[in-house]
UniProtKB/Swiss-Prot annotation:
General coactivator that functions cooperatively with TAFs and mediates functional interactions between upstream activators and the general transcriptional machinery. Binds single-stranded DNA. Coiled coil: none annotated. Keywords: Activator, DNA-binding, Nucleus, Transcription, Transcription regulation. Disulfide bonds: none annotated. GO terms for cellular component: nucleus; transcription regulator complex. PANTHER family: RNA POLYMERASE II TRANSCRIPTIONAL COACTIVATOR. InterPro entries: PC4_C (IPR003173), ssDNA-bd_transcriptional_reg (IPR009044), Sub1/Tcp4-like (IPR045125). Residues 158-172 have a biased composition (Acidic residues). It comes from Neurospora crassa (strain ATCC 24698 / 74-OR23-1A / CBS 708.71 / DSM 1257 / FGSC 987). This is Putative RNA polymerase II transcriptional coactivator.
Length: 172
C-alpha cells in the first residue's frame, strides 16, 4: 500500500481567506407594477421588467400577442430574438391555463397572486378542450368504430387447395 499523505499544516495566517459571493439578490423578487406605453408603430405594450414587454400587433391581417425581450440599440429599444408571438386562439388557451398554472406554482410553494383571476374557479385537473384535441378524439372514435366492423379473412387459396376442394365437390 502506498504511504498515506500527511495534511499540510496550516501555519500561515497571512494568506487572505476568500469567501464565495452569493449570486444576485437573496430576497424574493417582488412583482413590479406594469407600465403601459406605445412604440413607434403605435402598438400598445406593457413593460414586464428586464427589457421584456408584452404587446399586441397586427401582422398580415392577423392579430398577435407578443411576449418578447428587447435590446438597446443606440438609445432605441429593438425586439430581440427571444420571444413568442401567440395567435388569438393560442392566447385564449393561455388564459384558460393560467389559473391551473397558478395552482401548480402554489403547490410548489410559491406565493402567487391572482389579479383579475380571483373570480375564476381553479380547475386543477380539468382537460383543456381545443379544436385540435376535439378533432383527434373524433378521429380516435371513428377508428374504433372501423375496428369493430367484421373483417373478411385475407387468405388466398393455393392451387393445390383448389384442386382438393374441387375433388371433394366432384365426389359428392
Amino acid at each position: 500500500m502506498p504511504p498515506k499523505r500527511r495534511q499540510a499544516e496550516d501555519t500561515s495566517d497571512a494568506e487572505p481567506q476568500y469567501t464565495k459571493k452569493s449570486k444576485g439578490n437573496t430576497g424574493k423578487a417582488q412583482p413590479q407594477e406594469l407600465t403601459k406605453g406605445s412604440d413607434q408603430d403605435g402598438n400598445t405594450f406593457w413593460e414586464l421588467g428586464n427589457n421584456r414587454r408584452i404587446s399586441s400587433s397586427v401582422f398580415r391581417n392577423t392579430t398577435l400577442v407578443n411576449i418578447r425581450e428587447y435590446y438597446d440599440a443606440g438609445g432605441k429599444l429593438m425586439p430581440g430574438k427571444k420571444g413568442i408571438s401567440l395567435s388569438l386562439a393560442q392566447y385564449q388557451n393561455l388564459l384558460k391555463v393560467i389559473p391551473q398554472l397558478n395552482a401548480d406554482l402554489r403547490a410548489q410553494g410559491h406565493a402567487i397572486e391572482d389579479p383579475g383571476f380571483a373570480q375564476v374557479a381553479e380547475q386543477t385537473d380539468a382537460p383543456i378542450e381545443t379544436p385540435k384535441v376535439k378533432a383527434l378524439e373524433s378521429n380516435k372514435e371513428s377508428i374504433k368504430k372501423e375496428k369493430k366492423k367484421p373483417r373478411k379473412s385475407n387468405i388466398d387459396v393455393t392451387s393445390d387447395e383448389e384442386e382438393a376442394a374441387e375433388d371433394e365437390d366432384d365426389d359428392e
